[in-house]
């Protein structure tokens, strides 16, 4: 009888520990992608942080934010040191074949940005022979290579600082999503301008590893996201950071 009680107590303790562990969610981000994720006065904040704070409340998650260079985030995800990446991750075919994704939560466009006064670049076709900066490991690097079949564009990768090299004339243009480019120009005051319209529409979502925990998180996050859309919370967070609903 005593042995049975010990086994039952141990099983209950193990079950409780499992439930507790499942509510701990580590969210990876760069902390350098204004206004999605950035640090101000030693506080991590932004659109992504507000979204996950709300998801955490609704799903009773204990959220831990893990910051790293963007180029290292997928490595952290694959080795289990984080549970997802919240850094405007575009759903490419290659990524969808490798990871589970929550439902898209941002719709945006791939945008060329140049030094102010440079009107010679208006689209991808004008980038031949030019040096174009992209963030290392971002989907924009591969997207640009897909357009540059003949290898005529000098694609230069950076961990950070692509906007400064374009402003200083060290690179002719950089590629990032249109929303971030607009906010970056507004925030930094650097002599930059958008070049033409976005050359590709993109949908961004949170990736998870395809395992038991990843599938559980995907379902729970999708449920919370749907509720947040329905009650206006997603729109409210979006308007706070962008002045418009960027999620549809």
From Swiss-Prot:
For this UniProt record, the keywords arranged alphabetically read as follows: Amino-acid transport, Periplasm, Signal, Transport
GO cellular component assignments: membrane; periplasmic space
Major site of localization recorded for this protein: periplasm
**Single Gene Ontology BP term?**
amino acid transport
Query: Where does this polypeptide localize?
Result: Periplasm
One example of the protein's molecular function in GO is: ligand-gated monoatomic ion channel activity
In terms of Pfam families, this protein maps to:
SBP_bac_3 (PF00497)
Signal peptide extent? 1-21
Superkingdom of this entry's organism? Bacteria
UniProt KW Nucleotidyltransferase keyword: no
SUPFAM superfamilies in UniProt: Periplasmic binding protein-like II (SSF53850)
The record ties this protein, via SMART domains, to:
PBPb, PBPe
The UniProt similarity line reads:
Belongs to the bacterial solute-binding protein 3 family.
Question: What the protein does?
Answer: Probably part of a binding-protein-dependent transport system for an amino acid.
What's this protein's name? Putative amino-acid ABC transporter-binding protein PatH
Lineage runs: Bacteria, Pseudomonadati, Pseudomonadota, Gammaproteobacteria, Vibrionales
Identify the coding gene.
patH
């Amino acid at each position: 009888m005593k042995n049975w009680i010990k086994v039952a107590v141990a099983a209950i303790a193990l079950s409780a520990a499992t439930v507790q562990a499942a509510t701990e969610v580590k969210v990876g981000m760069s902390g350098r992608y204004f206004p999605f994720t950035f640090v101000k006065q030693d506080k991590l904040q932004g659109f992504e942080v507000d979204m996950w704070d709300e998801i955490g409340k609704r799903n009773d998650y204990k959220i831990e934010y893990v910051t790293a260079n963007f180029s290292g985030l997928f490595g952290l995800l694959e080795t289990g040191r984080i549970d997802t990446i919240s850094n405007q991750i575009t759903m490419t075919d290659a990524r969808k074949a490798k990871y589970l994704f929550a439902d898209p939560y941002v719709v945006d466009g791939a945008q060329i940005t140049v030094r102010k006064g440079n009107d010679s670049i208006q689209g991808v076709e004008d980038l031949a022979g030019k040096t174009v900066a992209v963030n290392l490991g971002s989907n924009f690097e591969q997207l640009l290579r897909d357009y540059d079949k003949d290898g005529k564009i000098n694609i230069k990768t950076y961990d950070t600082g692509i906007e400064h090299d374009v402003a200083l004339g060290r690179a002719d243009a950089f590629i990032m999503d249109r929303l971030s480019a607009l906010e970056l120009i507004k925030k930094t005051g650097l002599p930059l301008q958008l070049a033409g319209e976005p050359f590709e529409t993109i949908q961004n979502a949170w990736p998870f590893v395809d395992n038991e925990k990843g599938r559980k998180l995907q379902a729970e996050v999708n449920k919370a996201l749907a509720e947040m859309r329905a009650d206006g919370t997603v729109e409210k967070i979006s308007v706070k950071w962008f002045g418009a609903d960027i999620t549809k």
